[in-house]
Amino acid sequence: MRNKFKPFLIIATIALISATLGLSNVQAEDNPDMKGWEADSPYNQLYDVREYEKIRAWVVRVKEVVPMPGMSPATAIDVREGDEVFEVHLCPTWYRKPSEIRLKKGDRIKLKGAWAEVNGKEVFLASKVKQDPDTTIIKVRLTKDGTPFWTMPPEQLALELKAP
């Protein structure tokens, strides 16, 4: 009797998992907080790997900003490198709130990402932030092409978050 239902249970389980994963992707796309953060949005198209750079800087403050008119808010940090203070965009606040970023004024950090002009202002679009000595604080984009983590399917995101 048990073996008779085994194929049915396997198929039902696979269908349930597939439906759940598909639903989570639809929910992300329909999420009003996603406004301006979609994978193909004008904002995300500003990440240019040719502008990729590694920077060591000091945290000035963690804050919330609206990168472009009509977008939902972003978590950002102001950092100081030498005499220059500039803004670093991390991710949408619904993905990671400023209060969830374990950084404070005076922390020494390493940034990886790309420079971009956003709404008339030169900013750094981060892909990864590490705190000296090499403690990863947040990974938000693929370094190789700038794909935002918040646009990835759950299974791909899980793999990326496990990677060093």
Regions found by a protein language model. Give the residues of each.
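Bacterial N-terminal signal peptides that target proteins for export
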Residues: 2-12
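Bacterial N-terminal signal peptides
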Residues: 11-20
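Sec/Tat signal peptide C-region and signal peptidase I cleavage site
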Residues: 22-28
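Short boundary/loop segments of OB/S1/cold-shock single-stranded nucleic-acid-binding domains
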Residues: 32-54
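Structural detector for short beta-strands of small beta-barrel domains
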Residues: 51-71
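OB-fold (S1/OB) nucleic-acid-binding surfaces
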Residues: 68-90
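Short nucleic-acid-contacting surface segments enriched for D/E, G, S/T with interspersed K/R
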Residues: 95-111
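OB-fold/S1-family single-stranded nucleic acid-binding modules
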Residues: 116-146
